Each structure stands twice: as C-alpha cells, then as structure tokens.
Amino acid sequence: MSRRKQAKPQHLKSDEELLPPDGAPEHAAPGEGAEDADSGPESRSGGEETSVCEKCCAEFFKWADFLEHQRSCTKLPPVLIVHEDAPAPPPEDFPEPSPASSPSERAESEAAEEAGAEGAEGEARPVEKEAEPMDAEPAGDTRAPRPPPAAPAPPTPAYGAPSTNVTLEALLSTKVAVAQFSQGARAAGGSGAGGGVAAAAVPLILEQLMALQQQQIHQLQLIEQIRSQVALMQRPPPRPSLSPAAAPSAPGPAPSQLPGLAALPLSAGAPAAAIAGSGPAAPAAFEGAQPLSRPESGASTPGGPAEPSAPAAPSAAPAPAAPAPAPAPQSAASSQPQSASTPPALAPGSLLGAAPGLPSPLLPQTSASGVIFPNPLVSIAATANALDPLSALMKHRKGKPPNVSVFEPKASAEDPFFKHKCRFCAKVFGSDSALQIHLRSHTGERPFKCNICGNRFSTKGNLKVHFQRHKEKYPHIQMNPYPVPEYLDNVPTCSGIPYGMSLPPEKPVTTWLDSKPVLPTVPTSVGLQLPPTVPGAHGYADSPSATPASRSPQRPSPASSECASLSPGLNHVESGVSATAESPQSLLGGPPLTKAEPVSLPCTNARAGDAPVGAQASAAPTSVDGAPTSLGSPGLPAVSEQFKAQFPFGGLLDSMQTSETSKLQQLVENIDKKMTDPNQCVICHRVLSCQSALKMHYRTHTGERPFKCKICGRAFTTKGNLKTHFGVHRAKPPLRVQHSCPICQKKFTNAVVLQQHIRMHMGGQIPNTPLPEGFQDAMDSELAYDDKNAETLSSYDDDMDENSMEDDAELKDAATDPAKPLLSYAGSCPPSPPSVISSIAALENQMKMIDSVMSCQQLTGLKSVENGSGESDRLSNDSSSAVGDLESRSAGSPALSESSSSQALSPAPSNGESFRSKSPGLGAPEEPQEIPLKTERPDSPAAAPGSGGAPGRAGIKEEAPFSLLFLSRERGKCPSTVCGVCGKPFACKSALEIHYRSHTKERPFVCALCRRGCSTMGNLKQHLLTHRLKELPSQLFDPNFALGPSQSTPSLISSAAPTMIKMEVNGHGKAMALGEGPPLPAGVQVPAGPQTVMGPGLAPMLAPPPRRTPKQHNCQSCGKTFSSASALQIHERTHTGEKPFGCTICGRAFTTKGNLKVHMGTHMWNNAPARRGRRLSVENPMALLGGDALKFSEMFQKDLAARAMNVDPSFWNQYAAAITNGLAMKNNEISVIQNGGIPQLPVSLGGSALPPLGSMASGMDKARTGSSPPIVSLDKASSETAASRPFTRFIEDNKEIGIN
C-alpha cells in the first residue's frame, strides 16, 4: 500500500535510521541537509526527489519550495502553531526546525545535556513522523486521505496549508522542531522513507520508547528548568506569542508533521506548553519525579522535551521551549498519551492504550485544532489530573513502560467515548458509576459491608447476593445498603460490634478459622481461643494470616467448624469442641461477643487464662473442651501435628469457641490484613479452590505429613498419596506373604498349607487367637489418618469408628492389606476382644469365602477371567486373606461383625466346600471339582448363605470376591486392581471397589437428613458438612448408624444385623462392582429362591437403619436398595445379563451407555495415555489372561509368544513395542484375545499386543493345566459364543454381570 506523504515532511536525522529504505536522507546528519535533500526523494515521495533542509531537516519535494524555504530557514525556528486556516508556506518553513533538526545545536542551550538524549529521541521521532505520513494522522490533519495512499503530489500541497493540528515550537538552542507524530507514523516506525517499512519500525519505536523513558529522567530535570522559565515567560502572551511564532513559523507543513506529536495544536502557547509539559510530566510521574501537573503553562513546556513540536508553550519564547529535548519521538508518544490524559485531543489517549508501541489510530489524533486546549490552564489541569494517578499507576505497572495508555483516561474530556476511561487499564465505560465500580478493582476498595458476617464487597449487587445466604438464619436482620468506610472496621466500639455490623463478629471469626484452619496465623496475642492451628502459626501470628481469620467471618460457619477441627489445639479437645463448637453463638451466646470490649485487650498471652475475663468466659467452654484455644506459639507445633488427623471431623464442628473479646480484637487488629479470598493461603497468598485444598496446601508450609505408611514409615501429605504408595508394598511384599491365617495372622506362601492350618484351628490343635473384629477397620482407620494412634494399634479399635467413618471404604482395603502384615510383624494384637466367637467367625468366614469363591468361580468362570482376576487366583488368595479381606472389605464397616454374624447364621457348613477349593496352583485338578461345586453350592449350606440365606453370608460372599481380588493383588497381580469395565488401574482394592460404584450407580452411604446417596463414606462426611451440626441426629455419630462401616469392635456383635445389612447392601454392590460379581450374582444364577431368601432376610435388616428408608427402589433379586428407578434398572441388568449397549467395533455389550463410551476409548490407542484410566499396564493382561496363578510373563511368553508365530508378523510387530514399553493391553483387549478363535478381530480391538485369538487356544490349554477355572470355562464360552458374536462380548457380559 502506498504511503501517504506528510503535508510538510520533515527529514529525520538520526544516526540509526529506523528505516534503512529511507536511505541517506534520513541518515543525513543535521548538517547534511543538502545531501538529504538530494536523497530526500527516496525517503519521502518514493518516486519524487526530496530536498532536505540541512538546518531544520524539512523536506521538500519541489526544488522551488526548498529554495524558498532556505531563504527563511533559521537554526532556531520559532514555535509555530498552525491553525487550519494558517497559510501553508509558513508552516512548511517552521516544521523544518523539527525536533529532529540538529541535536548538535540543541547542545548550544542548557538543554545540551538533554540534547543528547533528545537527539536520540528526535531521531526516533522523525522516523515515526515519516511513518505517520503513511498512516495519516487521525486527528485533524487536512491529509485526512492518509488512510488511502495519497499520491505524492497531494502531500506537497498539504505543506502549503497544513490544517493539521500541529504545533511547532522553537526549541532554544536547537534545530529540533516538533515533527508530525501520528500513531500511524509510530506504527510505521521509522519507515519514514518506505511505506512498507512502517510496520517493521514498530518494534524499533517500542525500543526507543523504552530508552526514552530513561532519557525522560534527564528530561524531567530539564522540564523543571523549563517550568521555571515558562513561569517567568509571559503566560498570557503564549497565545499572542504563538501567533507571532506562527507567523515566523509560517511553514504549515511543519505543523502537519507536528500534529502527531503535538496532537494538541495549542491555540495558545500555554496550551502548547501544557501539552508538551504533559508529555514530560508523564515521564516524570513514571520516574517518580514530581508530576508537572502545575497549572502553569510553563508546566506544559516540560512536555517540550517530550514533544519538540510543543517544546515551548510560550511560542513567543521558543528559546525556553528549546530545552525540550529532541527525544520528542518517544516523549511525543508518551506526551500524547499524557495529553491524552489531558482533556483535549489527547483524550483519545485511548490511543495511548495502543501507544505501548502499537500504532494506534488514536495516537495521531493530536487533533490539529488548537481548540483542544483552548485554555492552557485547562490543559495543564488535565495534565496534572492525569499525572496524579500516573505515579500510582506506574507503581502498579512496574515493568510496563509509561505508555500513553496510562494517561488516556482524561485524554479527551470532551470526547464522550473517552470520558469514562480507566486511567489504570484504559478500559472505557459507559457511565461514571461503572467506572467508579471498576476502579475499585484497582484500588481494592470494598465499600459495602455485610452487617451480619462482616464480609466486604465492591458493589451493592454483590452484597445483595451474598446477603441472601443469611436470610434463612437471620430473617429479621435487614441488609445495610450503605457503604461503610473500611477504616471503621478498625475502630472498636463500646458494644463490641464493629461499625456497620448488626451482630457481633463472632461468626466471622469462626468463618475465619474456617477459611484458614490450617494456619491460625492470628497473632497469639489476639488471644483467640482457636489455637494457632498451624504449627508454624506462632511464626505467622504476625502475618496477614490473622487477617484471613478476620475475613473468614465472611465464610459460612461450617467452614469455621472445619477450621476448628483443623486447629491442632482442638484435636484433643475435639470432641468437646464439637459439642461446644456446634454453634459458637450457642456457646458464646452469640451476643456475648459484645463483650468484645475486652477485645481491645491484646490477650497477647494467647493463653485462655490470660485472656480478658470476658474472653475467659467464652474461652471457658474451649478450655472445657480441653483445648486452650489460645495456645501459645510453643503449643503450635504440637497442635499442628494433632490437627492434621482431625480435619475430617473438624469439618463437622460448627465453629471454635473463642472469646468474644479476642475475636473482636482480632478483627480489629487484622482488618488491614484481611485477605481478599477466604481460601487464600495466609503465608504465600495463593488462592486455593476450596477449604480442603487450602488445608492440604498449608501442609506444604508446615511440612506436615499426617499419613504414614505403616510398613516403611514414609509419610505423605494426603491420604491419596499414601494409598498410591501402598501399591508399592502390595506389588512385592505380598508375594512373600500371600496367605495369612485369618485367625492368628500366620503367613503361608501356599494356600493349601494355609487351609490345613485353618483346619488345625478348627480342630482345636492350634489355639484360636483371632484378630479383633474391628481390627481391620481399625487398621484402615489407622492407615487412613490417625497419627496419634499411629503408634498403638489398640487405639485404632477405638478410633476406628470415627476414623474409618470418613474413608472407611477407601482406605480400608489399602490399609488392611499392609496393616495385616504390619500387625503380624509387629506381633501386636488388636486390643479388641479376641472372643472365641470372633475367631470362629473369622475362620468360618474364611471358609465360606473360599467356598463362595469356588462356587462363584464355577458359576462364572468366564466372568472371573474377564474380571481381571482368575477365580483360581482368588481361591488361593481366599484361603490366605479371604477373612482378612472380608474384614477389611466388609464395606469398610463391621465386616468382622458380619463375618461373625454370618458365621452364626451359617456356621462352618461351607468349610468342606471351602477346603475343596484349593490354591490356584493346586487347583488345576480341582477345577473340575470347583465346577461341581457350582452345582453343589446351591445345596450346600455355604451355597445357601452365599445365595443370601444369611445376610452375613451374603456379606461374606461379597467380601470373598474382594478378598480374592485382594489376594491376587498380594500375589503381585495388579490386574486385580484394574477396572474390568473401563480398564482404569487403581492402587488398591478399596479404590477399585469405590470406582466400580461409578459403573453400578451404587451409592451405599445415604445421608439421614436429605436421603442423598454417596458412593463413599468420605463423600458422605463431606456432604454432612452441608448440614448444620445441630441438624444432624445424634445417632448419626453412632458407629452402628448408617455410617456403620466404622462400627467399633464392641458393637460388632450387637449390631451384627445392621452391619450385615450394610454389608449386604453395600457389600453386594461392592462384590458386584468388583466384578467378582458372582457372589450375589452367583446366587442369582443359582436358584432364585436363595436370593429371595436373602431379600427377605435383608428386608427387616434394612428397615432399621434410617438411611435405608429413603431408598424406595429394591432389587427383587438381591435385596439391594437404590435411590432411583434408573439406578435400579441398571442394577437389574447385572442379574438379567442384559447388555443393551453394544460396541460396534468389537461387539462387546455393556449395561450402560457410559460404560460403552469408556470402552470405546480402548479402541483408540492414541488416546490411551491421555486419560489416567486409559493407562495400559503390562500387569493388566495377567488378570484378564486368567485367574490362575500363572504369571503373565509365563502365559505371555510361553503361550502367547509361542502362538505369535501363527499370526501374521505384521500383526504382532505392531504391538510388540507397546507391550515391551509397558503398555500392556487393556483388560478388555486382553480378554478379547483370550476369547480365542477370533483372528479376524481388528488389531485396534485390543487383541493387539497378544497373539491372534487363534493362537490363544493352545495358550488356553496351558492355562487349564494351570487349573484356572476361568480359562476352562473360557473354552466353553468361546465355543458357545464364537459363532454368534466376538468372544469378548460374551466375556464382557459375564464380567458386566459380576461387576454391575
């Protein structure tokens, strides 16, 4: 696009030509005017010759004009303010003195020092000037056509009558004159000569601007001098002087050049000065120099340095202006922005926003009419206004150059669009009110205060929304719609209620604790009862963390309760606190906070005793709790250690008891420290998403690691990390201790030996010292998070109820496995009563589990294969850890009690059967026996219980599959922890069990208040936090309650029925979820009668627990209850085998669309790594390949590898790398291969890594030799279903049935 020529182009003399294309003309030194003139044509017209005046650097495309100009040109051109009607010729002459003219001459004046800097700027500016011509000045340039490339000729005429709002000011002792400074020019950069160069020049301009900022520091000094000079110079004269100046500076072209820079054609010298001053003033502001906001027109002159064009406001005395440095280019940029801040033309300062270096059409808007600053005082005032915020702004924008954008806000007070512009971020608003609200985001002002909790908001609307939260609890209190000055928050009142508050700050304090439970950074001096929960709290006491507390009031009390629980000090007092803390108000009497007067007391002692009497009164409850709320910093470390374990329960507490006085005092002292976000870390100020995340985050500061591995002693900050870590021990140590006696915990590597050992117990040959019923749970809870009891297993039994409650299901399994070995190693027996009954129950449970496992295996051999853990594996494991698993497995609750009850319900009848099932290794021959067991199972007593004859048995059955899975896991077969539906691997069985609930839609933990179902106890506990503690029925906290999974040992027997119910309800779901699915499903396959029996048995059991009543949808087959018809419908498919959703690729069918979607991901290899659940692990194939004890390596290398030869090499090679890399096929994929005889399956189906299905047949044979029932049944299944559909689908069905 052709560049539009300036009306009065002025050659830019700069050692560094921003635009190489410009060639010599621009490079010419000030003295090279003649040469420049020769080369000029290149730079300006491109096609025309350009003559450059060596004195003023003015460019002329016509020789005649150039000669005429030389006659009148002087080294010190007067300032010329060009009005639109001004004669073109004069402007041309004066523009010549463009700031770029000769830096050397500038040296003549006092500005000499400044001249150096200005010289550079001047050079830059000319470049911009040239660029500007291209862009055309947005402002009043007569060359409005600039947007369209105008022919070179038109520009020339422009010289004659540049109506551009360019003001030329003579710079004393310099040739520098203001050059046109349009934004376009800036954009064009130094493309003075070549239009194409303009764009490239932008970066250069930006760099120069940065340099100019530094130069401006020097300019500021000059500006000060200029100010004084201007003040001395005729302020009134400016205009007159300007007019005279205009006459001498008749060259209108110069103004055209200047318009960009001077954007504000100063009708009066003072205005010009103001503009100029504003330019430098901005820099001053940035630099922290005093803003040149002085109303004096002279003040504006300081801008002169910024804009040569406006160098001397008093045109009459151009000399004073002369000091303005040539740096004008940048200063101009900055000055424009500044002027933008000034009401007039610069108002378009929006261009300033662009100014940062982007060519902003607005920049050129230095409107060409002096009208912009008709009154110098006005412009000065505008400049001053702009500068005031600038200094502050610069502080905020540390790294950002003082781009004009900063000044934009007031740029054009006259321009309605820019009237409401933010001076900090240049955003434009439609109204002043909107702007004022926006400014609060910069200032942090929050004038509207909630009169209930003390939270502050930037707008009344936000306050209204927030206030709705209090309507229910405080319907009688009206919102205070009026702003409350924040400083009043620090002013104590006789009532103890801060200004603008209708209630004492007690609740807010609680909230504060809530929000910052981990680090009660509140100074110990505050005397808040809440113990500095963070060990390092004492260190932080002075830190703003305390303020967060004050802010916390904004947060709901529940959070505060959490905080209380978090506070270490509360740990030992926790129970007491819960009572007292239920409602801080109740404790304190709410109003008592008015005692706040004592709040003024520093309570620096931070000890309850030291607290003021009023504080003590409120503190007393805390002390009663036994937690010195105001624990001194010395106590903090201990507290931190304690609180970690307490977090889960602390959440239930409504709030901590704190003295009203201390609370109020804390509020007062910490108001200034308030944090904007309730979930903000008081130490590093990081904002977390929620309280729980904040709690965990604080551990990074405190170094707290509340979750310790009982095996290796490693500690972790989160329970999840600990669970994941447990997998490390399961993978290998379990290999050494595959089987443990459920009674004496003795370890056996051979399942058969274990069975014999159990028989010895049964025969009385070995003393029965069974693990306490609650041992497993206790272990789980211990592993879960009780640090205090970590050392003593005995305490776990007691703590089990609470601790296990939270994540019973989750941690139990993980903790249980490692826990057993720990106990055995430790040699410490759980203190729970080792009643003979419990031991017998444990033994019977184990036997029953074995039987049920065998029967289940027989019933669903195929299923077992698919389930990812061979039944045989389970069997072997069953004997070893079936009981243990049952115990731990039992829905993370009185599993033992169930086992005992089940034992009573169905005494050892299953023992014989259980004995039949032998370790997988031995099982090869026995597998056939196992199959018979299927038929026998229904008849055998064990079968009946398994079918559900006894709820306890049902639970056992469920547990058995889990235990089997667990055992397989212990063996080191990770596949048991891989979801058979979606292939996601999990670190432990408990995690897998919980995960299966996402497929089965089972939500065994039901809130007694709202009947909402939760998949885990932890989720239920979190949900309970949504209910106020008062609302929760006392029985909720009874271990035997719906939360029963955490029942204590003593109550195990007494609560056997409810427990069993739980187990059955939860356990069945769990068993099914595991995909062992046979336990109950097996019963289903068996005569329906037994199931129905189970159902009836469950019915009475289910009735008692209040949580069961809400579930109205009961499964007729297994008695499970569901909260919705859809969940029941999905569940019923596990009994009917219906799988309406089929995979179009491999033919596998699924019970839910969600499962199908997940499965589809298995066909997309590229996506596998993307999702955690899609990870392929070499171990996964083991589970799928068979339940028997065969190692995957054996199966794969011998069977599959041998078969690989039968497959097309390309088929095998495709996936060889994946397998070797550890990307084992997914369970589903492996099962597909195992299904055997489906060589045609696409590689993508997941048959991938394994040899073709055809090769699997022989592999299957070997598997059979390994006596894996799953494999045996697999053959049958394959023969039966191969013709109709891919074998994978058949297996999937089985698996689905088991899982769902």
From Swiss-Prot:
Keyword Repeat: yes
PROSITE patterns: ZINC_FINGER_C2H2_1 (PS00028), ZINC_FINGER_C2H2_2 (PS50157)
Keywords for this protein: DNA-binding, Metal-binding, Nucleus, Phosphoprotein, Repeat, Transcription, Transcription regulation, Zinc, Zinc-finger
Compositionally biased spans, kind Basic and acidic residues: 122-132
Main location: nucleus
Zinc finger (C2H2-type): 51-73, 420-442, 448-470, 679-701, 707-729, 739-761, 977-999, 1005-1027, 1113-1135, 1141-1163
Listed Polar residues bias regions: 577-586
Tissues expressing this chain: Widely expressed in adult with highest levels in heart. Expressed in fetal brain (in neurons of hippocampus, cortex, mediodorsal and ventrolateral thalamic nuclei, putamen, cerebellum and brainstem).
Region (Disordered): 1-51, 84-162, 234-258, 277-352, 523-633, 864-955, 1259-1279
Location in the cell: Nucleus
GO MF annotations in UniProt: DNA binding; DNA-binding transcription factor activity, RNA polymerase II-specific; zinc ion binding
Family the entry assigns: Belongs to the sal C2H2-type zinc-finger protein family.
Name of this chain's protein: Sal-like protein 3
